[in-house]
């Protein structure tokens, strides 16, 4: 079968078919390939480099898709900002527990205070991390 194909196909058909197969499927469907002769192929090879033969594909975004992207950014940033409110609630819980613990056993004042500072630091770090993620979503994406 391969020997029959060698006799049927011409060099220009093989070259135009190979160019057709190297293009993306969307470009093949949307645009029909040009029939190239040996003279036009040789003039293309001499006059322009191979990189200029590749068609540039520009992505176009509509106003609706840009609005959807913007809305998704705001929703994601709002969800990340909820963590900052959780951090505030955590800090309140830590110091509320410090007051209750000190009222129950005043002799553990130093140990309770060190645990409260540790809880405050961890809660504040999580709040700052959530705020950083919210800003990254808004301004870096």
Swiss-Prot record:
The modification N6,N6,N6-trimethyllysine is found at residue 109. CDD domains: ATP-synt_Fo_c_ATP5G3. It is a multi-pass membrane protein. The record marks 124 as: Reversibly protonated during proton transport. One of its GO terms (cellular component) is proton-transporting ATP synthase complex. SUPFAM superfamilies: F1F0 ATP synthase subunit C (SSF81333). It is found in: Mitochondrion membrane. Trimethylated by ATPSCKMT at Lys-109. Methylation is required for proper incorporation of the C subunit into the ATP synthase complex and mitochondrial respiration. The chain crosses the membrane at residues 82-102, 117-137. Residues 1-66 form a transit peptide. One of its GO terms (molecular function) is lipid binding. Belongs to the ATPase C chain family. Mitochondrial membrane ATP synthase (F(1)F(0) ATP synthase or Complex V) produces ATP from ADP in the presence of a proton gradient across the membrane which is generated by electron transport complexes of the respiratory chain. F-type ATPases consist of two structural domains, F(1) - containing the extramembraneous catalytic core and F(0) - containing the membrane proton channel, linked together by a central stalk and a peripheral stalk. During catalysis, ATP synthesis in the catalytic domain of F(1) is coupled via a rotary mechanism of the central stalk subunits to proton translocation. F-type ATPases have 2 components, CF(1) - the catalytic core - and CF(0) - the membrane proton channel. CF(1) has five subunits: alpha(3), beta(3), gamma(1), delta(1), epsilon(1). CF(0) has three main subunits: a, b and c. Interacts with DNAJC30; interaction is direct. This is ATP synthase F(0) complex subunit C2, mitochondrial. It comes from Pongo abelii (Sumatran orangutan). The gene is ATP5MC2.
């Amino acid at each position: 079968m391969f020997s029959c194909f060698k006799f049927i196909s011409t060099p220009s058909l093989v070259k135009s078919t190979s160019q057709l197969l190297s293009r993306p499927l969307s470009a093949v469907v949307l645009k029909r390939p040009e029939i190239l002769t040996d003279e036009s192929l040789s003039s293309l090879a001499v006059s322009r480099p191979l990189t200029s033969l590749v068609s540039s594909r520009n992505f176009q975004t509509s106003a609706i898709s840009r609005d959807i992207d913007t809305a998704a950014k705001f929703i994601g940033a709002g969800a990340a900002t909820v963590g900052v409110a959780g951090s505030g609630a955590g800090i309140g819980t830590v110091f509320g527990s410090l007051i209750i613990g000190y009222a129950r056993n005043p002799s553990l004042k130093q140990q309770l205070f060190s645990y409260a500072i540790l809880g405050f630091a961890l809660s504040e770090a999580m709040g700052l991390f959530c705020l950083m993620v919210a800003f990254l979503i808004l301004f870096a994406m």
